[in-house]
Swiss-Prot record:
Keyword Ribosomal protein listed: yes
Keywords: Ribonucleoprotein, Ribosomal protein, RNA-binding, rRNA-binding
GO cellular component, one term: cytosolic large ribosomal subunit
Name assigned to this protein: Large ribosomal subunit protein uL3
Family to which this protein belongs: Belongs to the universal ribosomal protein uL3 family.
Transmembrane parts of this sequence: none
Job of this protein: One of the primary rRNA binding proteins, it binds directly near the 3'-end of the 23S rRNA, where it nucleates assembly of the 50S subunit.
Oligomer and partners: Part of the 50S ribosomal subunit. Forms a cluster with proteins L14 and L19.
Species, as recorded: Prochlorococcus marinus (strain AS9601)
Domain of life: Bacteria
Length: 217
């Protein structure tokens, strides 16, 4: 399995296809990343490739972190991510990982932290229907029943209620790569990806087996 790449979400735009239809796209600054460690079954119990992305200041790193990063290059990196692989023979410490690892028409899975919306109610967070808005109603945006009475005498875990909305790690699968600019390290994918502009995201090849992900028929 091929490894992925770390990048930064730049924002959204649009492209026009051959028929003149507007296609929403997301612009991603993907890499360049550096291989910082190769993990083997003998030493670590599993096989993986660790990469780093984004520059960091020395004062923000501990001595062990600094020593670990300097083994693969002179620049100190801020974000680390590892990918499980069957073998590491095709990788070496210090090797650059760029958008050239991807190709137009390929499908990718993108993970990131969704935009936080703070404390939200039932309608906004879960899409509940509101109550009557007419005169005399006291149930405009109330949740309704949250469970039974004496038995079970509690609210079951997982009950959809008001609370913090967003700000979680999520993955959007099967996004189509429409354009690649290796000079500017740009990756253009169809649709939206998690996070706000400037947030760090993880892009890896789509590995759904036996399913047609991303595109709707």
């Amino acid at each position: 399995m091929s490894i992925g790449i770390l990048g930064k979400k730049l924002g959204m735009s649009q492209l026009f296809d051959d028929k003149g239809n507007s296609v929403p796209v997301t612009l991603i600054e993907a890499g360049p990343c550096r291989v910082t460690q190769l993990k083997t079954t003998a030493l670590d119990g599993y096989t993986a490739v660790q990469i780093g992305y984004g520059l960091s200041k020395e004062k923000h790193l501990s001595k062990p972190e600094k020593g670990h990063l300097l083994k693969s290059g002179e620049e100190l990196l801020k974000h680390l991510k590892e990918y499980r692989v069957e073998e590491t023979s095709s990788y070496e410490i210090g090797k650059q990982i760029t958008v050239k690892n991807f190709e137009v028409g390929q499908k990718v899975d993108i993970s990131g932290k969704s935009m936080g919306r703070g404390f939200a109610g039932y309608q906004k967070r879960h899409g509940f229907s509101r109550g009557p808005m007419s005169h005399g109603s006291k149930n405009h945006r109330a949740p309704g029943s949250t469970g039974a009475g004496t038995t079970p005498g509690r609210i079951y875990p997982g009950k959809r209620m008001a609370g913090r909305y967003g700000g979680k790690q999520i993955t959007t699968k099967g996004l189509l790569v429409l354009k690649i600019d290796d000079q500017k390290n740009l990756l253009v994918v169809k649709g939206s990806v998690p996070g706000k502009p400037g947030s760090i995201i993880n892009i890896k090849p789509n590995n759904v087996v036996g399913k047609k992900g991303g595109e709707k028929s």
